[in-house]
Amino acid sequence: TAASASATASSAAGQAAGTLSGNVATGGSTSMKNVIAALTEGFAEVEPGVTVSYDPTGSGAGITGATDKTLDIGLSSRALKDDEKNDVDGTIVALDGIAIIVNKDSKVADLTVEQLKKMFTGEITNWKDVGGDDGEIVLVGREAGSGTRDGFESIVDVKDSCKYAQELTATGAVISAVEANPQAIGYASLSAVGDTVAMVTVEGVECSEDTVKDGSYKIQRPFVFVTNKSAALSEQ
């Protein structure tokens, strides 16, 4: 999980400081903000001469950046597709739950995967049909190319068929939109969700570090470091 990645960084920091110098450019998944921050902090204690930058441009851009070598490490919050593996390698560094979030005023506390599928494809359009108050459901999601969107749509089986009212370019923007609208529902990285919105359970299982680890929470995906196959080890 993201917390495990942080612990790994702290462990690495306990080793003797090295003598490397230079810059490492990372970019991609906005959901990996907390993970890359924790790893960067730990790495800085081991190799203080290396500067690590992070550009939150989305998973698709992270994979592209690693492919065309504009990034040293691309960050993807989804597994690599077969046609993307020709030029780059993917290394899983953490697992993350995709939390289903609603406004804090919502009466809905649990949804099934089937209900989510019907809601996001427009078959269910009113909250009263899933135990909430009478009101039109407002679907908030991520933009095409987002790893979070890809993970959610693949697991819920709604690939390219969602009826989004809003398609936003960052995890934080989705959370803010759901916070501001009592009728909204969206999805976001567990590592990014705070107390401004409510997380619903999925088929009775909460989205947490423990349920992601043991696999009981169904809507989860990997966090992946993407590196170019042709880059020499000294360059990476």
What does each model-identified segment do?
Residues 2-236:
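Exported/periplasmic ABC-transporter solute-binding proteins
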